[in-house]
Amino acid sequence: MKPTQWLSAVVSLAALALPATSHAFPIAATGTGLKVLVGSTSDIIATYQGNSASFSNDLYLMLDAGGDPGDDGNTSNDLFIFNNHGSAVGSTVNLGSFSIGTELMFRLHVNNTGYDFFTGDASRNPDGNAHANVEEDWLPDETLVSFEDLYDGPFDYNDLSFSFTNTVTTDPNQVPEPGSLALLGLSIVGLAGIRRRRQPAN
């Protein structure tokens, strides 16, 4: 093979490899607009998973003036976690522990445009669209969150991905519905009846 043919083959192979590596990090596949909730009393560890964004984005945990999770309208209270270009993939931040069922609201600040986008309901965002996918149990006991940083999309959620331990998307404190309780009660009554029938008569 001539050197020019060899060089051409190498360049062609490199070009084919580019699309495969453009998203060489996890992107949450489900959970558009879901909330991130505390699932246990253990510390919540955030891990930076990667991005393919051209814009520079900062990730914050929203806190109120007392340092508790929440949105009091003052972003200077928020805890900086990662920057999608400055943080190393795999880096971690311990966010501490919180009461089970507490919503952790995350804010993505887009440095290039000044927009802020949030986890949870679409109504929190300036364009009225959900800007985060939240995938519970992406890994065992770990939730994956992926953000979109552009106003009005394209909603490929590849602009900053991060994961958290000890978090869920359904409230662990949620009381079962009355129908579920009734079904459970009938099951217990049925088991008690079967047990009585099996007991020998005296």
Where are each of the predicted segments found?
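Bacterial N-terminal signal peptides that target proteins for export
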Residues: M1-S8
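Bacterial N-terminal signal peptides
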Residues: V10-A17
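Sec/Tat signal peptide C-region and signal peptidase I cleavage site
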Residues: L18-A24
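A recurrent domain-boundary module in secreted/ectodomain proteins
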Residues: L150-Q174
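A short, hydrophobic C-terminal helix/tail in secreted or cell-surface proteins
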Residues: P176-I194
